[in-house]
Structure formats: C-alpha cells, structure tokens
C-alpha cells in the first residue's frame, strides 16, 4: 500500500464551464425550454436520456462487483462483513420506517386531498391497470428468491444490482478465505478498478446530453400545466422530503460530526444528474467513488451503497404513505388507526419488493393499496399525471439518504478518515491525497 510522503500541490480548479454540475444545469434549463415551447420535439428527445441511463447501467455491475470483492477480500476478519451488513440493515430499517411515518403525519397535517370529493367509480382505471398488474408480482418470497441468480453470468447480463451484490459478497468471502493463494486474483481485480472508474469518468461526460433529453421529454410530454391541479400534493411531497433531509438526516449528520448541506454540495454534480434523469442509479458509480474519496472505507462503501439502493428508499417511502392518504382523503375514504397501521406495515414490505423495478414508486403504491382494500386502487388515476414530477424528488431523497448512510455506517465501524471527509466537504478536494482504505477491524468498532 502506497502512503504518500507529502501532500500533492493543490490542483488548479477547472473553469466553471468545464465543471460537470454547471454543464448539467445548463442542459436541464435548455431541455426545459425546448420541452415547454416545442413539446413535440421535446418528446422526441427521450432516447437521449434513455441512452445515457443505459450507458451508466452498463458499468454499474462491474463497479459494484470490483468494489465489494476487493473490499471484503482485504478484510482480515470475515466477521466484519456480517457486522457492517447488520449495522447497515438496522440503519435502513429504522430510517425507512421513519420516512413512512413522516409521510403519514404530513398527510394528516396538510390534508392535500381534502375537499376534492372524488367518486372512485367515475375514474378511468385503464391508465393504472398496467401498474396494478405489475404489483401482483411483488411478494416478499419472490423478492428473496430473485436475489439468487440463475447463473453467475446472468446477474451481470440482466444488470440486477442485488444479484451482483450477492455474487460479489460470496466471491469476496471465498477469496479472503483462501489466503495467499488468492493474492494474484485480488491484485488483478485491484488493478482493474482504475480502468473501470476511468470508464465511469468518460461516460459521465455524456451526462449533460442525457439530462437534456430526459427533462425535455418530461416537460414536452406532461407539461408544466399538469402540475396545477395537484400542486398541493406535489408541493407537500417536496416540502416533506426537504424537511426529512434537512431536519432528520441533518440531525444524524450533525451527531456524526458533519453537515448534510456540505455533503449535498460535495455531491452537487451527482444530485443534478439525478434531477435531470430522474434516476438515482445514473449516479451510483460516481457516488461510490466519491464516498471512498471522502474517507469512507472501500469495504463499507461496497456493502452499504448497493444495498441501500434497494433497502434505503427514504424518498419512495415518504411518497407511498403521503400518496395513499391523499387518495383516501380525495375519495372521502375514512381510515381507522388500525387501517393506517396496516398500511404502514404493508408499505414496509412492498417498498423492499420493488428493488430495481422501473417506476418502482408507483408500482409499490399499487401493491400496497391492493393489500389494504379500504383505499381504492382506482384513486391512483388521480396522481398518475403528476407522478413523473414527484419521481425526481423521490430519487434525490433516496440518493442523499444513501450518501448519509454510507458516512454514518463508516463512522460506526471506525472506518472513516475524518480529515479526508472534512477536506472534501469544505470544497478542498484538490488537497486530498490518494485514498488510503481504512480497514474496519483495524480500529475499535463503535456503536
């Protein structure tokens, strides 16, 4: 392991027009203008956004596999893997449940659907039929069985994050178990990390094009005008998500010695990319690299980030309970405390079953309402038109939640370089030396 003898000279910052976050901002603005004034042309820009997301998905599996395998194989005690995973899952379960409760509380306070007096029988259910059909496949057993791939190769071919995670953990444990015999393979995989992340950097140069196409399509197809009728619901959701991040996650960050706002600033390029593409997956490889650069252990990053993308969906959870109670209020459906507790419990399970599913938020909502028959599934037609505009906020909240979780779990494990984190969050990335991985078991575990 190379340890630098002196800090490198600070690199000259790039001009603003060459920085990714600025390019993405310009692309989003131009895409919105095109979609608004030339909606038919804007709709035709959809392939640009789809192509970029597919490019990123192409590299996600290798990034996850290499990060997890090299991280686990470098651990001297395999029980550390189980400890990190257990702490991560405990964090995910607590804050995912808290997000569901927050969405429910806000729905009661704001009452976004009150006074609409909608008759569910008069709603057009054909538009939501396909989502309801997909929701029938979301069962806990089916979700658990889907984690196991049919072959070692199929997980990479299908791009299933959980399956790649499963294979990587097993292979990393096996590689660590064989000791010195596995060293050549570990060295090869560690050498492979550099070109793979270089490829990520190359692909990210296309981010402005992808963001332009995705936002032009959204505005062109759905129009800003579709927000007016349900602006109270959309506004309530955005405000709730912001308060969840600023207050709840903000307190967690403060207790761990850093600011959630500085973390968001550090990840501004990734957040803008998520905003433009409405997909948190589009920034997954870059998030993993940046969290490691900010002082989080490679092994913790490799376990927490991919797992969090399936189990730590704070934004989706807020949306589910808020939208469900909005539908109940709009259709004058009375829900007892027992009904609402049942809704909460079902949402806890169904939100885990939609990992990696396109349109996961809407599909999990359909799955939840199907199990809690008191809320009419037909009421989903009310929010179908504005769901796309809430998708960006869901993705942004999910993304920030996973970034916070990575730092918190790293700190719990004593696997966080706080000096690197402070430099990164203060915007002094040019002063950062090459990352030196902190192996969790080398330090006393905390928490």
From Swiss-Prot:
Family label: Belongs to the dicarboxylate/amino acid:cation symporter (DAACS) (TC 2.A.23) family.
Top-level taxon of origin: Bacteria
Signal peptide segment: none
Keyword vocabulary terms for this entry: Cell inner membrane, Cell membrane, Membrane, Symport, Transmembrane, Transmembrane helix, Transport
Subcellular location: Cell inner membrane
Name this polypeptide is given: C4-dicarboxylate transport protein
Primary location class: membrane
PANTHER family assigned: AEROBIC C4-DICARBOXYLATE TRANSPORT PROTEIN, PROTON/GLUTAMATE-ASPARTATE SYMPORTER
Membrane topology reported for the UniProt record: Multi-pass membrane protein
CC per GO annotation: plasma membrane
InterPro entries: C4_dicarb_transport, Na-dicarboxylate_symporter, Na-dicarboxylate_symporter_CS, Na:dicarbo_symporter_sf
Gene3D superfamilies: Sodium:dicarboxylate symporter
Keyword Transmembrane helix carried by entry: yes
Regions crossing the membrane: 22-42, 52-72, 90-110, 159-179, 199-219, 232-252, 325-347, 366-386
GO terms, biological process: L-aspartate transmembrane transport
GO molecular function annotations of the record: fumarate transmembrane transporter activity; malate:proton symporter activity; succinate transmembrane transporter activity
Role, per record: Responsible for the transport of dicarboxylates such as succinate, fumarate, and malate from the periplasm across the membrane.
